Amino acid sequence: MLRVFIFFVFLGSGLTGRIKPQITCKYFISENNTWYKYNVTILNSTIVLPAYNTIPSNAAGISCTCHDIDYLQKNNISIHYNTSILKTFQDIRIIRCGMKNISEIAGGFGKELKFLDLRYNDLQVIEYNILRKLIRSNTPTYLYYNNLMCGKRNCPLYYFLLKQEQTYLKLLPQFFLRRINFSNNNTYLYHFLSCGNKPGHEFLEYQTKYCRTKFPEINITVNQLTAKKNTERYKSCYPLVFISILCSCISFLFLFICLLRSICKKYSCTKQGKSGHNSGHNYIPLIPSYTFSLKKHRHPETAVVEDHTTSANSPIVYIPTTEEKKVSCSRRK
């Protein structure tokens, strides 16, 4: 009996958990700067955000997060938005609730709107006029991780983003990493115009193909963006290029010095060899310890070698050449 009781307790708790709405909502009271949680009810398979007669009149904001949108879809539970109540809020946060079109709540954007968070929904198209209104009013707007698609329907928005040239060019890489920041520094788009998660250059070509007929100016802007992107990419490589060029110059200088030294060495050796054998002089160097003395002999062939190693100032005697020997011989004859 105890096991059966425990089984039914777990079964009942599981069914109760599935019946409970998978949405957590809070309202914000600006007087004490506090968020208060309130329950969301399902009426006729429909959830209305914000809920009727649940939020006090002095609430300044609404925040709802759908924890299990798959559960709501499987059970055919739809979400409707009460735009008449939304107009009274300055802070609207509807996260992960499967919103497919921003126009569902755009009618509830009042002039006092100061914050809009629609992250993790299923937005595919953002109307140009709605986004322009949010940006002009300097409203912090978070639209990232949606499913915005390429195509003609988003051409006005695409053109608007390209016109944000100063900011857009600076954040071009981040744009393709699912983020773009507008000039008011408060509006962010993540995963904008996914195009099947195409890389940056393919995205430009793909989206431009759809929008060039309606906005011819896009072609010029895309070329500017591409050139700017390439310039920014190359700027990051400048230090490496400088280092590589410097290393190349040093290695070339080293090789040049080595080559110059080898050439000079070879040239000096060749010059020394020529001066030793082909100088044209007839003087034969003698060993200092042995000289010839011609004081007592008239003829060179009868000269006697004398040892002068003991004398400090021993004379160095000139040795006659072969021609001189021939002349002396002819004289003798």
Curated annotation (Swiss-Prot):
Topological region Cytoplasmic: 261-333
Disulfide linkage: C195-C237
What keywords appear on the UniProt entry?
Disulfide bond, Glycoprotein, Host endoplasmic reticulum, Host Golgi apparatus, Host membrane, Host-virus interaction, Inhibition of host innate immune response by virus, Inhibition of host TLR pathway by virus, Late protein, Leucine-rich repeat, Membrane, Signal, Transmembrane, Transmembrane helix, Viral immunoevasion
Induction per the UniProt record = Expressed in the late phase of the viral replicative cycle.
Q: Which modifications occur after translation, per UniProt?
A: Highly glycosylated.
Q: Which InterPro entries match?
A: LRR_dom_sf
Give the UniProt record's GO annotations in the biological process aspect.
Answer: symbiont-mediated suppression of host innate immune response; symbiont-mediated suppression of host toll-like receptor signaling pathway
Domain of life per record: Viruses
What role does this protein play? Viral TLR3 homolog that probably prevents TLR3 dimerization and subsequent induction of IFN. Inhibits dsRNA-stimulated activation of NF-kB and IRF3.
Family, per the entry? Belongs to the asfivirus I329L family.
Q: What is this protein called?
A: Transmembrane protein I329L
Q: Which organism is it from?
A: African swine fever virus (isolate Warthog/Namibia/Wart80/1980)
